[in-house]
């Protein structure tokens, strides 16, 4: 089980990303638009830098919903390899069975 503080910190980051997503996208569009004057694009860059660091999507870490583990994460199932093996062997995940041949 991961530290509760790490899991909560990641949840706070997810909330910040949602809150600032529109503003961040608008500013990024201005910065990337080559047709706009350089001064306006520079102002947008400064305003983008003033946003909280944790409002950037790259700061979010994919974590297992069962254990909170950050590594060995399967995106489709939103869980780690260890939780997948445990729940799969117990038959609690539909369609997952232990392989035997």
From Swiss-Prot:
SUPFAM superfamilies for the chain: Glucocorticoid receptor-like (DNA-binding domain)
Any one GO CC term of the record: cytoplasm
InterPro entries per UniProt: Ribosomal_uS14, Ribosomal_uS14_bac/plastid, Ribosomal_uS14_CS
Presence of the UniProt keyword Cytoplasm in the record: no
Molecular function as annotated in GO: rRNA binding; structural constituent of ribosome
Record-level GO BP terms: translation
PANTHER family: 30S RIBOSOMAL PROTEIN S14 (PTHR19836), SMALL RIBOSOMAL SUBUNIT PROTEIN US14M (PTHR19836:SF19)
Subunit structure: Part of the 30S ribosomal subunit. Contacts proteins S3 and S10.
Function: Binds 16S rRNA, required for the assembly of 30S particles and may also be responsible for determining the conformation of the 16S rRNA at the A site.
Family (UniProt): Belongs to the universal ribosomal protein uS14 family.
NCBIfam families for this protein: PRK08881.1 (NF006477)
Protein name as catalogued: Small ribosomal subunit protein uS14
Organism phylogeny: Bacteria, Pseudomonadati, Pseudomonadota, Alphaproteobacteria, Hyphomicrobiales
């Amino acid at each position: 089980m991961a530290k509760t503080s790490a899991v909560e910190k990641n949840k706070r980051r997810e909330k910040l990303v949602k809150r600032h997503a529109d503003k961040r996208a608008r500013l990024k569009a201005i910065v990337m638009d080559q047709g706009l004057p350089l001064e306006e694009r520079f102002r947008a860059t400064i305003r983008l830098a003033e946003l909280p660091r944790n409002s950037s999507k790259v700061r979010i870490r994919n974590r297992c919903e069962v254990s909170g583990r950050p590594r060995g994460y399967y995106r489709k199932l939103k869980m780690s390899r260890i939780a997948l093996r445990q729940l799969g062997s117990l038959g609690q995940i539909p369609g997952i069975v232990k392989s035997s041949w």
